[in-house]
Amino acid sequence: ENVSKYVFDFNSAVAESALYKYPTYEQRTVICCSTQSGCPVGCRFCGAGDAFVRSLTANEIVGQVEHLFADRNIDPTKVERCQIMFMSMGEPLLNLMGLAPAIRRLNRLYPKAALLISTSAPKVDYAQVRNLSVEVDKVGLQFSVHESTDERRNALVPFKAKLTLAEIAIEGEAWFEATGRQPFFSYCAHAENVSDADADRLMNLYKPDIWQATISVVCERDESVAAANQRQRDLASDFMSKLNERGFSTRCFDPAGQDDIGGGCGQLWFVQDWMRRNPTLAKRSVGHGLPVIHTPT
């Protein structure tokens, strides 16, 4: 078992985090933590896509990380490669007031740790993101693209106040110019978006000498069934090869622990149950009532 999953009940909000080891905590530790309780963006493959409670405070964000290290008796100073990713529940850039001070504190507490902001690209002031990334040189930036056309992406990510694919390219290049670090785009590889034409569109949008690609095997929303099946892994691997041929550096996001208690964002049973038990706190998001995309068969 290389993954541990945690739920935090803040009384007025619920959050979740995941802790990974590859293969030991001393060699590589990865933490995925929440920045919001629920999510207003409503991605149709995400278990948190139906409801939004509130943004988390900086203390609540930092507290998740501190608890995970303490719970497994991990000494961050002895970890060869440590990564803290803001990519569990919530859209980080819709909580810059909580995220920015949390990043500064985490950088002071764990100066060796890489800090990754994973965003669906809402329309916010990206100059603030660039400035924060220059100030804290451990910050990385990843845009959740997931499709090669805006039409298909809009069906997957119904939140309207977001950047287009072309606008993401512009902001990513500006971030690269400001920081000297390569941004990532993440892409959910499924049966309908892994053609050569998809790879060509991505290459035309995102310059391979600037961008790196993260290909995800998890494109389903499901509380009880393993999502990262072998077919998904094969699709991801084949599409990574297509992108490699076009000059991209690629990596695979294959989160361990996609098991019968639900491993993806917002899928842990306690989170789902908490949302159902607190209808006055868990407000309907833009995705509520829309069809689920890529449901497992």
Kindly label every feature range from the protein language model.
Residues 39, 43-46:
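Short cysteine clusters
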Residues 1-35, 67-78, 281:
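N-terminal [4Fe-4S]-dependent radical SAM core
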Residues 21, 142-145, 254-256:
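Residues at the C-termini of beta-strands that transition into short coil/loop
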Residues 10-12, 21, 37, 90, ...:
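Short, flexible active-site-adjacent loop segments at beta-strand->alpha-helix junctions, enriched
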Residues 33, 55, 162, 229-237:
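Short, conserved loop/turn and helix-capping segments at secondary-structure boundaries
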